[in-house]
Amino acid sequence: MRFGKEFVSQMIPEWQEAYIDYAYLKTILQDIQASRNRSDSNNQSSTPSFARNLTRRYNRDALVSENHDIVVNTVTRLEEGLETAAYETTFLKAGEAGGDFEVTFFRTLDREFNKVNNFYRLKVETARTEALALNKQMDALIAFRHKVMDQNQKNPSVFDSVSEDINGSASEVGSSSKCTEHNVALADLMRNEDTSNESILERIRMNKTREITPLSAIKTILKVHKQDELKFTRDNLKEVEKRLQVAFIEFYQKLRHLKNYSFLNASAVSKIMKKYDKIAKRNAAKLYMEMVDKSFLSSSEEVHKLLLKVESIFIEHFSNSNRREGMSHLRPKINKERHLITFSTGFFFGCGISLIVALGLIIHARNIMGTPGQRTYMETMFPLYRFFGFVVLHMDVYAANIYFWRRYRVNYSFIFGFKQGTELGYRHVLLLSFGLGTLSLCAVLLNLDMEMDAQTKDYRLVTELIPLFLLVLVIIIVLCPFNILYRSSRFFFLSVLFRCIAAPFYAVHLPDFFLGDQLTSQVQALRSLEFYICYYGFGDFRYRRRNTCTSNIGFRTFYFIVAVIPYWLRFLQCIRRMVEDRDLSHGYNGIKYLLTIVAASLRTAYTLNRGSNWNITAWVFSGVATFYGTYWDIVLDWGLLQRGCKNSFLRDKLLVPHKTVYYAAMVLNVLLRLVWLQTVLDLKFSFLHRETMVALMACLEIIRRGIWNFFRLENEHLNNVGRYRAFKTVPLPFNYEEDGDHHNN
């Protein structure tokens, strides 16, 4: 792999603007090369051959002996009221042919390197601050452990060694710095003023971040103080250790990213200078790299020292001195693409295609669509099986989302908060999707075969139960507690789903409202689940020809309620965020879902009770809800249609290089949001059953949601890039009274 591609692939996506602009520097080198080629061609046409050879030999000898193509100076600049060191390169041969391009090259390189050096210095300063916070947290943990452990313990020095290790880390890190002021500051920060456990316990309180009950959630909303008095129990000790373990892991990841950032940028400067020397026939790389090696970016060993100490402390005190176990937490293995996954995905895909073809042939050969029971089958069995079709389609769309997020470097695993090493790739999702699709198609074919075969008519009851068996199997797999079939992802999904259902009582994070939005596109799937309950719960499956669900008052009532539930949950999430964040924009977002609730209810009412009044009312509210929702999708969720941006009617930053993709997505979003017109216009096609039409409209909504997913996360990613937000904030378990709450917010 060429360095340019490797450089981009190893970037931290949220920090991409803070890296050396390697691609732009290469374009300047191309200008230098073109200029020198023109100069050489002019010299060749005007200089005799013998004289030209002598001149070329003389210039080559001069290049070897002359090392003063550039002079690198250190200057002091005032930025935001602070004096910072910067580097300026003076090109000494600007008067030569093409010298203006070389001046531009060094000016750009200096600007890029100073940007990188200052950014790295700022992040190291932040790491120092976090090291201080973790040091104080460890002091509190030591004191807390003493209190929990047996009071008659004679040898507490085992626990005290943790604080000594961290303090020693601070001293060693400080001594490695080239800046004396930083040495003193870091040593002062990391040194405990009072090592007395009792005095520490007097100055700390526990920060409770878990919202287990509605009462704790209400206290959070009302801004009741979240600090509890210290209760020296083993449960609290386990909770503190767990949260500190997460904090150390996250801090370690930050340090690794910083180390990688330093190495990549130094390598980029080295590569670009070697290219410059080769193209311009200069000898400037050695002198410039001497400056780079002496800069803070390359000379500071603080990050390396902290990495070693964090490893030592974590292994000793969070992994029982088991290095392999400790490093498995600090450096989790990256999921590797296995050939078995690819093979299995292709196998299930082939099986699915074959089963679809077989299904079509059976329907045609046996003339199932022309049989008297076709209408009854479409009103009973089809709503049961189409649930799996909706799920499979949504999983396929999500797999496509993952593929394009990875292709355009959208850090979806960080945005969703997936644990490193457990996130699913698009191949894994497709494997599950095609597997479920194959299983569902097998059930459909088995059902049809048993229905049409005279020898199995005595087992009609078993035939009717096949969809229920399939649903129960899927539920068992999702709830399976064993570590099979991506347990971490299944449990993550279930936890997010639970928080969606309990929306008012839990803080709302991006995965919560993202899943809530997915549910709003699965209304027909939820109605299929309702039909499962009615069809099997009330015994209609025993007498298929006597389907009483559609005429049941309770079923018709819940037919309304089920369509409203996803939008109502999203509305509650918006209200919770508005109250918690004191941000009215969440309230305006809630209005969108409230309008959709009214519009969906009116359309459902019109479907069940035809009439001009219902039709007109459904038209009006559906139109308003569609306009409001489309505006919110495109302008706020996607961040498009910005005024004064360099990309007309889009935004300044675009990850997809083709603008037509964004324009097409906006048009498709509008068109697919208008699928409700089929309901109010009462469109019918002779070759399509009404249930088939409903299923097609639901599939179009799922596809629209997939398009929305990509651009929604793209916009979220670009917001993180603008704020250089590449790490999650980990709440610490203890709060020191003199520090205030801001350390843990």
UniProtKB/Swiss-Prot annotation:
Subcellular location, in the record's words?
Answer: Cell membrane
InterPro entries under this entry? EXS_C, PHO1_SPX, SPX_dom
Q: Which residues lie on this side of the membrane: Extracellular?
A: 364-383, 449-464, 637-660
Q: Topology versus the membrane, per the UniProt entry?
A: Multi-pass membrane protein
Expression (tissue specificity): Expressed in root epidermis and cortex, leaf hydathodes, pollen grains and stigma apex.
| Matching Pfam families | EXS (PF03124), SPX (PF03105)
> Keyword Cell membrane: yes or no?
yes
Q: Where is the SPX domain?
A: 1-290
Induction per the UniProt record: Not induced by Pi deficiency.
Question: Which residue intervals define the domain EXS in the entry?
Answer: 550-744
Q: Tell me which UniProt keywords the record has, alphabetically.
A: Cell membrane, Membrane, Phosphate transport, Transmembrane, Transmembrane helix, Transport
Q: Name one GO biological process term.
A: red or far-red light signaling pathway
Residues exposed to the Cytoplasmic side: 1-342, 405-427, 486-615, 682-745
Q: Enumerate the PROSITE patterns for this protein.
A: EXS, SPX
Q: Which GO terms describe its cellular component?
A: cytosol; nucleus; plasma membrane
TM region(s), chain numbering: 343-363, 384-404, 428-448, 465-485, 616-636, 661-681
Function according to Swiss-Prot or TrEMBL: May transport inorganic phosphate (Pi).
Q: Which family does it belong to?
A: Belongs to the SYG1 (TC 2.A.94) family.
Instruction: Kindly provide the name given to this protein in its UniProt entry.
Output: Phosphate transporter PHO1 homolog 4
Which organism is this entry from?
Arabidopsis thaliana
Q: What is the lineage of its organism?
A: Eukaryota, Viridiplantae, Streptophyta, Embryophyta, Tracheophyta
Q: Which gene encodes it?
A: PHO1-H4
